[in-house]
C-alpha cells in the first residue's frame, strides 16, 4: 500500500464488516470511511492446529508413523502440540500481533499504548470506531469517493470506472 500511497490517496470504504485481516489491510490508508453499523477492529491474532489423532485412531483405526529431522518438524493434526511447539506457536502469534498493532499505530497515527488498549481482538461498531480513531468518517462508497476526489484535488473533472470481478466457479454459470 505504501507504493500506491506514493502515487495517489488511498481511501477505504468499509461495508458491513472489515475486521481482523480486513482492518489489517485498511489501517495504513489515507482515510477510512465506514457505516455507523460497520463491524471493524478485531485487532488480534490467533493460531490453532486441530488435534484429531485420538479420534482418527479410535473411530477409523488410522495411526501415523513419522520420520523427522528434528523434534518440531512434524506439526500434524494427528497429535497434540508439545510444550516446546506450543511455545513456538505462541511466540509466532505474539510477533504477528506486535506487527499488527504497530501497523495500526502507524497507519492511524495513534500511540502503540492506545492501540493496545483497543486491540485484543475486540470488534467495534462504526460509531465506536470513529470515537477511538479506527475510522475517519461515516458513510458508504459515495462518501469514500468524495473523500478520494477531495484528497486527490480532482475538482469537478473526474470520472469513475467501476471494475467488477468476473464471476468464477458456479457463479459463472
How would you label these PLM feature ranges?
Residues 109-139, 144:
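Amphipathic alpha-helical substructures
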Amino acid at each position: 500500500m505504501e507504493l500506491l500511497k506514493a502515487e495517489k490517496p488511498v481511501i477505504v470504504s468499509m461495508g458491513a464488516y472489515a475486521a481482523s485481516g480486513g482492518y489489517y489491510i485498511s489501517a495504513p490508508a489515507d482515510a477510512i470511511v465506514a457505516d455507523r453499523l460497520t463491524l471493524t477492529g478485531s485487532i488480534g491474532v490467533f493460531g490453532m492446529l486441530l488435534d484429531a489423532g485420538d479420534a482418527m485412531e479410535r473411530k477409523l483405526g488410522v495411526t501415523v508413523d513419522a520420520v523427522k529431522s528434528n523434534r518440531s518438524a512434524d506439526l500434524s493434526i494427528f497429535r497434540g502440540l508439545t510444550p516446546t511447539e506450543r511455545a513456538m506457536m505462541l511466540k509466532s502469534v505474539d510477533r504477528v500481533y506486535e506487527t499488527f498493532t504497530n501497523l495500526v499505530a502507524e497507519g492511524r497515527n495513534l500511540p502503540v499504548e492506545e492501540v493496545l488498549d483497543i486491540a485484543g481482538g475486540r470488534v467495534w461498531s462504526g460509531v465506536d470506531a470513529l470515537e477511538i480513531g479506527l475510522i475517519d468518517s461515516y458513510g458508504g462508497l459515495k462518501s469514500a469517493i468524495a473523500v478520494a476526489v477531495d484528497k486527490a484535488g480532482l475538482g469537478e473533472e473526474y470520472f469513475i470506472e467501476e471494475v467488477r470481478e468476473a464471476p468464477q466457479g458456479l457463479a459463472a454459470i
